[in-house]
Amino acid sequence: GKKMESLVESYLIKSGYKYQDDYLKESFLIDAIANWNIDVPNLEKMDQSRKRFDFVLRTTNQVYGIETNFYTSSGSKLNETAKSYALLGLQAKDIKGFTFVWITDGKGWKNAKKDLRNAFQSLKTVFNINDLENGIFDQFRNCHGNG
């Protein structure tokens, strides 16, 4: 929950992103792009265009909708989230200039490896705390496509 969001935000800041200029917290995607006056064609193709993301990040070439969570145990919530985010990732592939990112971690994944593997197959932008420590947000600045 909030601890994971705070951790992710600390890495955004560490990578030089500034709140409101470069990223928004708990923001609807369409509100964020309107606020920044960015054109994201075909956004309506994504069922979740009205979705509130934990973070919306913008770089020169890309807008990222970022969801974060940490699972201390496995279960149906983890499974449903994995399926939902995999679908969101598939829809996002058709939207030039937008990438969906899922940052997740926790020991709950130890017993749900199949769900995580399935999510990875359709969503190439699944990251964990180790990826944050290794500067994944620095790489976003240079990204020109959906993952």
Where are these regions (language model features)?
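A short, highly charged nucleic-acid-interacting micro-segment common to nuclease
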Residues: 1-17, 48
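A short acidic/basic microdomain associated with nuclease active sites
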Residues: 15-47
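Glycine-centered loop/turn motif at secondary-structure junctions
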Residues: 16-18, 96, 123
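Short, conserved beta-strand edge motifs with alternating hydrophobic and charged residues
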Residues: 22, 66-68
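Active-site beta-strand-loop-beta-strand hairpin of nuclease catalytic cores
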Residues: 48-65
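Catalytic cores of nucleic-acid endonucleases
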Residues: 68-114
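Domain-level recognition of nuclease-like catalytic cores that cleave nucleotide substrates
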Residues: 102-147
